[in-house]
Amino acid sequence: MTAIMTQTLGQPVPPFTAHAISVSLPTWRDNVGYEEGEKRVVNSMVTGYPRFFIHKSIQKLASICERKFGSQGERCMLFSSKKTAEFCREFMTNHSPNPQSPVPVRLIEFVVCPDEITAPSDSRCIDLHIVLFPADAFPIAKKFWQHTGMGISSRTAVRCLTRMSDSPTSPTKRDHPPALNRLPSKPQNRHYVVKSPPPIPREEEVEDVNSYLEERYGRNLPLGYAAAAKRALRRRIAGVLVHDQCNNIQDTQRLPEAGGDEAVLGPSSRGVENVTEDDVFLYPTGMSAIWWAHHLALLTRPQQKSVCFGFPYTDSLKILEKWGPGCYHFGHGLDSDIDALEKLLEELSPNHSLSSPPPILILFTEFPSNPLLRSANLPRLRALADKSGFLIVVDETIGNFVNVSVLPYADIVVSSLTKVFSGDSNVMGGSLVLNPNGRHYAALKSTLQKEFDDIYFDEDAIFMERNSRNFRRRVQTINENAEAVCDFLRSFSSSTTGEPPLVKEVYYPKFITRENYDTCRTADLAPNVSAFGGLFSVTFTQLAASHAFFDALECMKGPSLGTSFTLACPYTIIAHYGELDWAGNWGVEKGLVRVSVGTEEKDELLSVFKKALEAAEAAVRTLNA
């Protein structure tokens, strides 16, 4: 169990965390101020959500690269592979303000190597792929960074900063840099820096101390075991580990059972028994897994529009809209939308047969959706996909595979490991799982094996492996806590005293599209076991109640979800501030408060929400006085 935590404006969430995923925005006004660029808020931001706020270590490294390689008036973005950098260049070209004169973009490869190999963690060079462009095109590059989640991680940046000097001069080009057993081929614009470590800046010094402590006291694998950590992650996600108990690792020469050759493997618990670790692919973020699922479909299937089924996380929809031919949006995600989808498919392909091109590329849906927690009728969608030949991609982040089994209905399942799989809110990650029983599995698998770049930074994988060891236990606690809180809040949605209700709606799988959710409930869970996940949203009958409730909540407040501590945000404000009316048309109200419940003591949580409701009631009384 964890204690209820709070944090001041602009500070990392969790506190004192160098690579925190969230940032504290503790009041409604703070969130509005952030969206409006209010100086009071912006100047307080020490960090932010990594795809929206570029971590300061990455900013520092980018500034060095701009001085070393850029021309006057140029800025850059940093990536971990040439392929990703080329994707960025293509996006910037395609989205140039003037198609007749596209933004000039150039790529440089910069290889950062240690001067002396003193530990396994120092044995690998880091390839930086620098995308340089005119400064006024930065917003376009930032959109690519945000939508795809394929930029370098903050740990990558810190590791690079420890291996190079912050010097404005160009690095030395070497044909045979020291400490390299094998010199990679040296194409044009490939540069190397190999230097003895300069005096280490404080942030990087703290990073090295943290890495030492994590390894020395058994919480993390040594960095030399990154391959084993990634193997453990793939097995954990595939659901093939018969025993997945990781104790403290004092013997650093011993691989953990989950990632070692001695691991006992069995049939998958994911609802498709023949899934293996080879069907699981790791990505640096959840959004990059979603981007690659869509890109994989574009590579293997006839070019058609996609379908976004339900109201999804904002960047998921942007991917479907901005890459490929576009998408149809069925934003409510209800059975009535499936009726409309059937009509659309008939209109697009009136005489469709199995030999005909599919009328759409993929159908993407979240199970359940964010933030309305609606669950699609997956069996019915699967039947449509089999009839029409399109792919189904399901994002299981919110349901998670402890609670729900969606793989039998999907061709591809994606997830943000950053969320509840990690729980600690200190590392990013994503996964993509192929269904080996899917009709298009062979084509998807062979193409992905050819196209896949392992750009998940080793240190991030190490932290993700450590964090996820108690994943199942955390989920069980979170399930129970969230159900108790939601039952409590819902009791205020219908009045027993003759007064108007305070709570308008509690969006939670137990209460929303319950039948569809239960259809996919994990088979080995007992009927009386809580399994609805930790996320819910709540709306109030008056906007003043939303403001007061949120401001009075004594918990962490900021973006993200799935944390081991309770985390809340005014979701529509931070995700759709520039399109509030559009979101409202899909039922995502301006006053919606989204809450990700943590592992705190249940009674303590209920007390916190009781106080927040009392504040909401007081605000309404004052308004009506």
What are the language-model segments listed below?
Residues L502, F532, L561-S564, G591:
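A generic structural signal for well-ordered coil/turn residues at beta-strand boundaries
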Residues T2-L255, S268-T276, I290, R301, ...:
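PLP-dependent enzyme catalytic core of the Aspartate aminotransferase-like
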Residues F452, L553-S564, A612-L623:
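A common structural junction motif
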